[in-house]
């Protein structure tokens, strides 16, 4: 599996972010892992990263978050200029077929994956969607 330079985790649950960060680092999936727990901060982070030329290679995005959710993030993400350089993987507990269909119809969502993240799932995501 190729190592990515930078991964961004967006999930309102800080414990989930911490666990996923450890899994990604342990699997040597990325050199750097940033975690953010809400959509406004994630969008601000991406704008700053873009201006510094340091956008994440992969964004793992939770769908169900209080306030602005994953779909709200995607609405704003589609307006950003980094969308061609970052791959979005929706990592969610949603079992809604409507969410899955909406993700499949998006030009910017690379994969719709059910939580929890594991080293094996990370490898599968890479092989199926990111390689």
Each language-model region and where it sits:
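Alpha4 helix (beta4-alpha4-beta5 surface) of REC/receiver domains from two-component response regulators
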Residues: 72, 85, 95-111, 124
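Receiver (REC) domain active-site loop signature in two-component systems and cognate sites
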Residues: 65
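Hydrophobic/aromatic residues positioned on beta-strands within the core alpha/beta folds
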Residues: 91-92
């Amino acid at each position: 599996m190729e190592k990515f330079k930078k991964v961004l985790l967006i999930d309102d649950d800080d414990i989930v972010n911490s666990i996923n960060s450890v899994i990604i680092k342990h699997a040597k999936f990325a050199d750097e892992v940033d975690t953010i727990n809400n959509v406004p901060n994630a969008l601000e982070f991406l704008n700053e990263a873009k201006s510094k030329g340091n956008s994440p290679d992969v964004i793992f995005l939770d769908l169900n978050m209080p306030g602005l959710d994953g779909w709200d993030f995607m609405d704003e993400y589609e307006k950003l200029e980094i969308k061609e350089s970052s791959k979005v993987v929706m990592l969610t507990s949603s079992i809604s077929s409507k969410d899955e269909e909406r993700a499949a119809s998006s030009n910017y969502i690379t994969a719709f994956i059910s939580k929890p993240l594991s080293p094996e799932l990370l490898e599968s995501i890479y092989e199926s969607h990111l390689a």
